[in-house]
Structures are given as structure tokens and as C-alpha cells.
Amino acid sequence: MNNSTNSSNNSLALTSPYKTFEVVFIVLVAGSLSLVTIIGNILVMVSIKVNRHLQTVNNYFLFSLACADLIIGVFSMNLYTLYTVIGYWPLGPVVCDLWLALDYVVSNASVMNLLIISFDRYFCVTKPLTYPVKRTTKMAGMMIAAAWVLSFILWAPAILFWQFIVGVRTVEDGECYIQFFSNAAVTFGTAIAAFYLPVIIMTVLYWHISRASKSRIKKDKKEPVANQDPVSPSLVQGRIVKPNNNNMPSSDDGLEHNKIQNGKAPRDPVTENCVQGEEKESSNDSTSVSAVASNMRDDEITQDENTVSTSLGHSKDENSKQTCIRIGTKTPKSDSCTPTNTTVEVVGSSGQNGDEKQNIVARKIVKMTKQPAKKKPPPSREKKVTRTILAILLAFIITWAPYNVMVLINTFCAPCIPNTVWTIGYWLCYINSTINPACYALCNATFKKTFKHLLMCHYKNIGATR
């Protein structure tokens, strides 16, 4: 019994470069990092799935990034830990190549997703009028699919079939590494394409994004808050619709007056005909006003502070006229590129002085929307998204740079890099997948609150968490 125990200890000592307590320590640390990576990225994916406020184009890119990081946490980290503590690759050449292909495809997909996020924000800032038209969920899905397909094409065939291309497998039994990394030209090319070029592009893009954002914030601060137009910059749209006069409601009652205060008015069976179908806005910042006027004189339309008084009249006359004005101010979602939209909809019937009365009501209500705004801080959604991109970019550069520098050095001087340093550099790339979910939570309060609700099993109203 003692002989068999001593034999197993001697075998471990011969194969593993680490002592027993070091192996235990490495397994505990690596296992913990793998677990945190898995939990963190599952939280990101579930949060985007259950919280409608996180279901934005920008966060769909983060969802794809979380998928890549989850695969790294489940497979790559644990297989590399096994390889490290044992001291040799025990699973054979086929599994070795499959692991390397999966590892590099997923890692490159992460880089591609970061590039997409950077380009997306860059176009949002530099082309705010033309890019939002193309920025749809379908387009986001196509870009994400392209990132994964391109990553697969770049890495998987070369890793899996290089031994057949050159006619021999030079990777020795018990070892697992990419065979073509022994070729200096190929190594330089892949390192530049997979790391250095993306980093340069992302850095330049972020510089432009940051400059444009600071310029916009500085411009907003220069304008006096009290004189700011709450609707500007906006796109004001108006359209006139003529309803069927035969459906006009009639009543024996005289002229009634309904006051709309703070954008809300009590509904009754008559006003319902005019205000029904009014567009509902999902954003808390959105406002909508419906004003109904009929058979009114110019002086019957009055305006007070935060109040619109409109006259609603009913007549037995079949030719009675009715005008409905709908104003909606649309505020974009947290990652939206689009400017604020104010829509003025005029619904009325034709008749004597009909157009004139529509114009009167429209002028009065549009004038109301342009009253001086109360003291209101500038929106921080743009700063929030820019800050998230910066955090992800910095985390990527810091964790990936050491390994990619060592890859270039290893091409000319393999003995120059100790195994321990190489292992740490390789693990730093994996740790990037652990850090990313923390970046989302630190830079986005909605992610942070949703994470908290999920971890504490508070599922009530989680879909509306902001």
C-alpha cells in the first residue's frame, strides 16, 4: 500500500512542474476564476433576456461577447488548467486541435465583437441622421453572425489542417500548441491581425467617440438651461387626416370645456373618439398631449403655464367640425443614436374655416411644447455607453497585451520566456472574460440592479428595472 502511494507521488513529481500544495492552490484559483466567469456571463445573458430596458442593439453585441466569454469559462479555462497542473497533454492530438480551434475562434470572436461595438458607437456619434435608419436588430444579428463566421474561417481550418498542408505533424506527443506558430511569418501575421490591428482601430475610434461626446456635452453646457428648448434638437412632423363626418358624435348638450393639465385630460365617451389610438411611449422621458377642439373661436383657445385649455363642442348640426391635435415627443433608448422626435398629428374634418382652426390649435400647442424648460440636467446615456466602451477596451488591452508580446518574442527566442511567465500571460487572456461582466455592472446601473435582483432571487418587476 505504502509502495503504491509512494509510486503515485513520484509519478506526479516526475510529470508535474509544481509541488502538491502548488497544484492544489492552482486548481482552487483557476476553478474559482472559471466559476466566476461562468456565473458572471450567464448573469449578463439572462439580464438582457429578462429586462426589456437592456434589450437594445448595443447590448445585443454585449450578449454575443458574453456567449464567447462563457465558452471560455466552461471549456478553455478548465482544459488549460488540466494541461498546466499535470505538465503534459493527456487527451491526444485530436482533442488538442479541437480545443485550440475552439479557444482561438472564440477569443477572436470576442475581439470582433469589440470592434463591432466600437464601430457602432462611432457611427452613432458621427452619422446621427443616416446611421440610425440602418441600425436595426436584423442588422445587429447579421454583424454578430459575420463576426463568428469570420473568426471560424480565420482560425479553425489553419489549426485543424495545418499538419496536412505541410504534410507532417511536428507537435510532439504530450504537448498541445498551434503548429504554425513555429513559422515566424505566420506568427507575426496572425498576431497583427488578431490583436495589434484591432487595438489600433479601436483606440482611434474611441478617440473620435470621446472627442465628439465631449464636444457635444461642452456645447450643451454653454447654452443657458433656462432658455433651452425642450423639444430641440427635434424633428417635427405634421399630418392632417380627414375623418368621416358621418361618424361624428352628436349631443344635445351645449359647449363643454375640458382642461388638459400637465399633458393629461379626463376621458369621456366623446373625447375617446379623438384620443384613442394615441401612441404609447416606452421611455419615461416621453410626453404626449392630446387636444380636442370644435366650433371654437380664436379667443377660446387659451394657454397658461403648464396648462392648455381647449374647448370641446357638440352640436346637433351634421356638419359640425372637430379637430384633434396629437403631439408626441419621443425619447430614444439608452443606446439610441436618433435625435428626439416631436410628432404633431392633426386630425380634423373639412368644413367652413376648418383649416384655419386646425392651424390655430396647432400653433397654440406647438408653442406650449417650446416653453422654457425647468432646470434639468443633461442626459448621461451617451456618457454611460462611452464609459462602458472605454472600460471594455482597457480591460482587453491590459489582459491581452502580455501574451501577444510573448508570442512575438517566442518566435525568435523560445528559451527567453519561462514557462511560468507564459502560463500567466495565457491566463490573463482568459481573465478578460471574467472582467467583462464587471465592466458592464460598474458602468451601467441597469445591469448592476438586474444582477442584484437575479442573485437575490427578486424576480418581481425585474423586467422593468432601470
Curated annotation (Swiss-Prot):
Phosphorylated in response to agonist treatment. Belongs to the G-protein coupled receptor 1 family. Muscarinic acetylcholine receptor subfamily. CHRM2 sub-subfamily. Its main location: membrane. One of its GO terms (cellular component) is presynapse. Residues 46-59, 120-139, 210-387, 443-466 are cytoplasmic. Interacts with ARRB1 and ARRB2. Interacts with RACK1; the interaction regulates CHRM2 internalization. Disulfide bonds join 96-176, 413-416. This is Muscarinic acetylcholine receptor M2. The muscarinic acetylcholine receptor mediates various cellular responses, including inhibition of adenylate cyclase, breakdown of phosphoinositides and modulation of potassium channels through the action of G proteins. Primary transducing effect is adenylate cyclase inhibition. Signaling promotes phospholipase C activity, leading to the release of inositol trisphosphate (IP3); this then triggers calcium ion release into the cytosol. It is found in: Cell membrane; Postsynaptic cell membrane. It comes from Homo sapiens. It comes from the Eukaryota. Glycans are attached at residues 2-3, 6, 9. Induction: Up-regulated in response to enterovirus 71 (EV71) infection. Signal peptide: none annotated. Residues 254-270 have a biased composition (Basic and acidic residues).
